[in-house]
Amino acid sequence: MAENHCELLSPARGGIGAGLGGGLCRRCSAGLGALAQRPGSVSKWVRLNVGGTYFLTTRQTLCRDPKSFLYRLCQADPDLDSDKDETGAYLIDRDPTYFGPVLNYLRHGKLVINKDLAEEGVLEEAEFYNITSLIKLVKDKIRERDSKTSQVPVKHVYRVLQCQEEELTQMVSTMSDGWKFEQLVSIGSSYNYGNEDQAEFLCVVSKELHNTPYGTASEPSEKAKILQERGSRM
């Protein structure tokens, strides 16, 4: 019975069999070469170490934009200064939190940003990786967001203050902290024993209502509290 012998080959530097502890026979070498070309083989996958977080994706995904940093990384561009860690992953010193939306865009062509992430952060990463279509998409999203914010109608809070004629000038002159005079309504006069009749007025004032992270309006200042106290006299 004939015996099967393997004719050993010296492992080529950087080629198939390198790092396996010895040479490979011609038959085994051909088999591994075919495996490397088979769809789904390890060679199509790329491991990235972005700011200490690992990402695993395909070369096809990273090569969506031929002008991008990631495309050049996959092509082993000699002009691109890139290192690998001990696991063989490409080292990229960027924020891994914002790399997720960038990678997902390359995977399916849609921009999906979690509500706790800022569009400006994604734009920074898109510009770093030089993904032209994503840069345009994020800029459009930022413009749309800013446009909606500017179209929100301004809300006002109104107060009606009651004062006598002698108090009117002082009250109007001391109004500040965003309060504005709106309308003055005469309500007749009041009679105090031993004094002359004094005209009384209702003074309507308003202030823009600004939203804050912890409520709908800021804490009133001392001058605003004075206006509120005068209004409570009604």
From Swiss-Prot:
Annotated keywords: Acetylation, Cytoplasm, Host-virus interaction, Nucleus, Phosphoprotein
Keyword Acetylation: yes
Every BTB domain range: 44-146
GO terms (BP aspect): proteasome-mediated ubiquitin-dependent protein catabolic process; protein homooligomerization
One Pfam assignment: BTB_2
Principal place of residence: cytoplasm
Domain of life: Eukaryota
Subcellular location(s) per record: Cytoplasm, Cytosol; Cytoplasm; Nucleus
Induction profile: Up-regulated in peripheral blood lymphocytes stimulated through the T-cell receptor.
N-acetylalanine PTM positions: 2
Free-text note regarding domains: The BTB (POZ) domain is atypical and mediates the formation of a homopentamer instead of a homotetramer. Homopentamerization is due to the presence of 4 residues in the BTB (POZ) domain: Leu-56, Gly-100, Val-112 and Ala-118.
Main function: Its interaction with CUL3 suggests that it may act as a substrate adapter in some E3 ligase complex. Does not affect the function of Kv channel Kv2.1/KCNB1, Kv1.2/KCNA2, Kv4.2/KCND2 and Kv3.4/KCNC4.
Protein's recorded name: BTB/POZ domain-containing protein KCTD5
Natural source organism: Homo sapiens
